[in-house]
Amino acid sequence: MTLPARTEVVVVGGGVMGTSIAFHLAEAGVEVLLLERDALGSGSTSRAAGGVRAQFSDELNIAIALRSLEAFDRFHDRPGCEIDLHKTGYLFLLDREEDVRVFERSVALQNEHGVPSRLVDPAEAKRLSPLAGVDGVIAATFCPIDGHASPESVVLGYAAGARSHGAVVEPGCGLTGSRSTAERSARC
């Protein structure tokens, strides 16, 4: 393995976050080197269930989630990989009145930002997810644009996309140290 002598950005970690950063920077014309000490996607991404959702309780996370869902919808075109995206919806089951009040406010905020979430009763929750146990459930929230995708496919798609834009992606190469120089660059 021969690493470049110079690069503009070093991304450490080859999971969903690192490969996404590498892809977007490389696509924007930035010289990128991505280092992953093990296999791509072998860290926390390897333990992710792949859930994707827009049901959050604050404006920032709702906005980020909506952008992510849009990106996942177009992933087969950009960066160009199938990620096994299924918009099956996401159901939160609630069994405490105080949680229902919190989720009612969250649903109102989500709706203000274009998220089609809604509060449902236990019978509709059971209809939406027949295997869900609804004993003790007093309400639920559901959003049909939520779902799941393959985290491994997302990682591999972003890594391939980053490479296609000139990034150097090096699995099996961990960062063991760095130091800053007067030019505000790092030496590894």
Regions found by a protein language model. Give the residues of each.
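Dinucleotide-binding Rossmann-like beta1-alpha1 core, especially the glycine-rich loop
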Residues: 50-128
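Helical element adjacent to the flavin cofactor pocket in flavoenzyme catalytic cores
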Residues: 141-188
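A short, glycine/Asx- and small/polar-enriched loop/turn
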Residues: 98, 131-137, 179-186
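Gly/Ala-rich phosphate-binding loop of Rossmann-like dinucleotide-binding domains
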Residues: 22, 26, 161
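Beta1/beta-strand and adjacent pyrophosphate-binding region of the FAD-binding site
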Residues: 3-17, 33
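Conserved dinucleotide-binding and phosphotransfer motif residues
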Residues: 28, 113, 164-165
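Short loop/edge segments at beta-strand edges and connector loops
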Residues: 36, 121-122, 171-173
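Glycine-rich FAD pyrophosphate-binding loop
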Residues: 26-46
